[in-house]
Amino acid sequence: MKLTYFANWKSCLRTLVLTMMVIVAVLAVKPAAVQAKASDYTQDTEGWIEACQKVGRDLTKYNFTYGSHNKPTLSASIKHGRKANCASYVSWCLQEFGVLKKGQTFYTRGGRIHKRFKSWRGKVQIIKVNKKLTSVNLQPGDIIGWRDIVHTNIYVGKNGKGQKLWLDGGSAGTRRGRVRRYYSADKIKTFSYLNKHKVSFIIRIKGL
């Protein structure tokens, strides 16, 4: 009888220890950041801008700096390097919204699109322009590729004064200094200097 009681007591103690070890292990694991899905956004201009602002907020939240050698996804960049530029920002926005698959990116050079994937899968319309910005009819949500500067950003609309508004994940979204640190890639701003530059092409998401 005593031996049976002792055996049961040892079994209970072993179970309790194992349970405590599991609890400690669970508590020690940091919760993963919640990743938004494309389905979390309304498939319209408002949802597209919201997705872009979410990416911009993450650049500030995770202390990104401006530069090259960035990763093909935002999550990979958060883990390694934390570098961004205008093209990676727009690419990550398109991934966030579901236009591009995770890991698909593009960049611009010489007024041309250089994509690191085979196809846009019919999700966008590429409009060749080659005109000064002031002569171009833009729609809110358009992605702009510039002819005479190596840059790409997102047109949001106009303010009450008729000034064009932008979301920009290039150096314009960073603080000046030896290290260009992001702080405003989620902020809608006017960039009047763009008025003198030429638009090479527009990437227009279908259905917006």
Where are these regions (language model features)?
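Gram-positive cell-envelope targeting signals
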Residues: 1-38
